[in-house]
């Protein structure tokens, strides 16, 4: 028993030596945080955890004008560094407010070059579907789907509220996407869950030959009551599942864990709502 307790104590010591809570200073306000792990561009072979989020600095309204980033080496999650504002957009004399963002890495199979796509969720008029790209996870980032005057997104830009992007690398040489090396999908919505496959040539529009899943997960505006049209078919549900159990509200976030795909989102408050 003593040996077991000592082992547990040592494990706890190791955990506290490499992590802390709260992990960011109390003066920082970074909601909508999306965690990602990328190779450190300044230390090849080393990896960092990146937190990308909106920035609550407006006080009287949600979020602020910048996408904020903090990062830490994966081997020591107590050493967080402020990477600063990694993206803002100024047009017509004012800054766009930025809501919940996402950031993904795409690696070219032939050259090995990495490109980072930022989905900043601008709330600027006609700029909500804005997508940016850069050569480093901490930027700088340049919009790739805006008109020349920076006021509007170009045709085909349809991504909406709280986007989450999933990049799936292709390893099967028989797969038609093997030469490209990946496929990408986007999930988004506010009280209405939508998903579709991205065109890998643009990373902001629908891939030709595919369709939009306009009702991906059942949404609610009251707990347990589906607000989608009666008879809606959901591609993300098994036949036995009850649509009233999902209560999608906003904040899509998807990951692959082992051989399973895990969809996380903010649900409409109810008896099973909680934070942990």
Features from the language model and the residues they span:
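Carbohydrate-active catalytic/glycan-binding domains of CAZyme proteins
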Residues: 19-276
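Bacterial Sec-dependent N-terminal signal peptides
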Residues: 1-20
């Amino acid at each position: 028993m003593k040996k077991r307790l000592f082992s547990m104590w040592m494990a706890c010591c190791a955990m506290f030596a490499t992590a802390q809570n709260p992990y960011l200073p109390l003066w920082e306000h970074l909601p909508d945080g999306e965690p990602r792990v990328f190779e450190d561009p300044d230390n090849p072979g080393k990896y960092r955890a990146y937190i990308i989020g909106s920035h609550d600095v407006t006080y009287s309204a949600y979020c602020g004008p910048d996408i904020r980033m903090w990062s830490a080496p994966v081997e020591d999650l107590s050493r967080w560094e402020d990477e600063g504002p990694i993206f803002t957009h100024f047009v017509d004399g004012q800054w766009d407010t930025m809501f919940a963002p996402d950031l993904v890495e795409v690696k070219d199979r032939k050259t090995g070059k990495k490109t980072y796509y930022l989905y900043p969720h601008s709330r600027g008029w006609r700029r909500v579907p804005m997508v940016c790209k850069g050569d480093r996870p901490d930027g700088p980032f340049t919009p790739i789907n805006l008109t020349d005057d920076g006021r509007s997104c170009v045709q085909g830009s349809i991504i909406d509220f709280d986007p989450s992007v999933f990049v799936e690398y292709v390893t099967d040489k028989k797969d038609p996407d093997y030469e490209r090396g990946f496929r990408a999908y986007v999930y988004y919505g506010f009280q209405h869950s939508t998903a579709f496959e991205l065109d890998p040539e643009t990373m902001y529009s629908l891939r030709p030959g595919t369709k939009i899943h306009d009702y991906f997960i059942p949404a609610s505006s009251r707990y347990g009551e589906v607000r989608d049209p009666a008879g809606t078919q959901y591609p993300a549900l098994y036949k036995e599942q009850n649509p009233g159990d999902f209560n999608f509200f906003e904040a899509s976030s998807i990951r692959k864990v082992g051989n399973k795909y895990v969809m996380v989102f903010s649900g409409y408050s109810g008896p099973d709502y909680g934070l942990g």
